[in-house]
């Protein structure tokens, strides 16, 4: 059974989790500013100033409508919204899939520079080599079954392999 802060997932635990799905759920008609306002109204721990700083660093204008932006920019906006929360748990589903290497670098820097350092961070990915340097522990799941749960150092020492090669 999965517990979040000692409780089963439910209405009360959702306020502690910041989730980035693999596919966007943001409405294309909305402006970036609408989305920032929505997240600020919805989540007590949302840091509006942090969101606007990250948006500004990418030259994304608050008045831009999502439907006018590239897929990569939309994904970055969604990541910015998720990482602008001071959550206890961040769950990121394939955050670097389908983007070019430069965008991957930006995404990883955004994650590392903006998550709550007291929080836990779970990243689901098939691109292990791109994130291996930031991992502490890994869980491998195959066909819905837990295959391995270990520290990265343990895999390297006992197996003599990188996590990606394992």
Residue map of PLM features:
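Conserved ABC transporter NBD signature motif
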Residues: 1-13
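ABC-family P-loop ATPase nucleotide-binding domains
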Residues: 19-77
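Catalytic Walker B motif of ABC-type/P-loop ATPase nucleotide-binding domains
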Residues: 90-94, 99
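Helical segment within the ABC ATPase nucleotide-binding domain
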Residues: 104-117
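A short, surface-exposed alpha-helical micro-motif characterized by mixed small hydrophobic
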Residues: 131-135
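ABC ATPase "signature
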Residues: 149-150
């Amino acid at each position: 059974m999965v517990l979040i802060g000692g409780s089963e997932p439910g209405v009360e635990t959702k306020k502690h989790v910041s989730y980035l799905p693999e596919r966007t759920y943001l409405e294309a008609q909305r402006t970036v500013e609408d989305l920032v306002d929505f997240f600020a109204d919805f989540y007590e721990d949302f840091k509006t100033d942090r969101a606007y700083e990250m948006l500004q660093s990418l030259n994304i204008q608050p008045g831009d409508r999502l439907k006018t932006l590239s897929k990569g920019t939309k994904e970055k906006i969604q990541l910015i919204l998720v990482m602008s929360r001071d959550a206890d748990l961040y769950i990121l589903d394939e955050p670097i899939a389908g983007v070019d290497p430069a965008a991957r670098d930006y995404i990883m820097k955004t994650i590392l520079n903006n998550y709550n350092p007291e929080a836990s961070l779970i990243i689901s990915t098939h691109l292990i080599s791109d994130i291996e340097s930031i991992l502490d522990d890994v869980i491998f799941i195959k066909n819905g079954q837990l295959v391995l749960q270990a520290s990265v150092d343990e895999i390297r020492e006992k197996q003599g392999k990188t996590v990606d090669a394992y």
